[in-house]
Amino acid sequence: VMKTFGMEAYFSLCEVAASHEEDKAEAILRTIVHGLSDKLGFTLLNDLRDPGVYRTFVMARNVGKEIHFHKEFLRFEELEGGILYAQIGPKNNIITFLMPHFADRLPLENFVIHDVKRNIFALHEAKKDWYLVYNPMGLDRIKYTVSDKEKQYSELFAAFFHTIAIKERENPTLQLNMLPLRYREYMTEFRQNVKTF
C-alpha cells in the first residue's frame, strides 16, 4: 500500500482500521480496489467522488481529530510509585497513535496510558520502547493511589482553573465546542474531587 499509494494513504488507511465504525473493512477494501483498478497511485485519496474513498476520508478525518484531541487533553497523574498514569475512553482504538507522541516527549518517564473502554494498557519504561498489554492479569482491578504531591498539584490546578475564569465572560456553548463533554471525564480540572483509581 505504501509503495503504490504513498505514505499519506497508508496512514489514512491505518486510521480507518482504528475506527469504531462497522463498515471500516469494507471502506478500506473498496478504496484499495478503486486505487488499483484506476491506477490512481499517490492521488488515490483525492478521488472523493468514489464512495469507498469518500467513506475512508470521513473515517480517517474523524479518527485523526480524536487523536489530536487526546494529544491535547490527556492528563497524567503521578502514582505513589512515581509512575505517570492517564486514563482515556476514546470512541476509536487510537492508543497506538498516541504512544509514539508521548514516548517521544517523555522519554525519561515511566508512564501508562489506560484505554478504559478496551481495557488496553500502553506501557512505557524510561529510556526504553513502549508496548501494549491487552487485558492483563487483573491490572484493571488493582487500586492505584495518587501520590500526595499529585493530590496537591491537582487541587492547585483545579483551583487555578476555576478562579481564573471571568464570570461575565463565561460561554458554555463555546467551551463545549472547544472541549466536548466526553473528554472531560478524565481531565483533572473537571473532576469534583481528587480520587484514587
Named regions from a protein language model:
Residues 1-197:
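Extended, well-ordered protein cores
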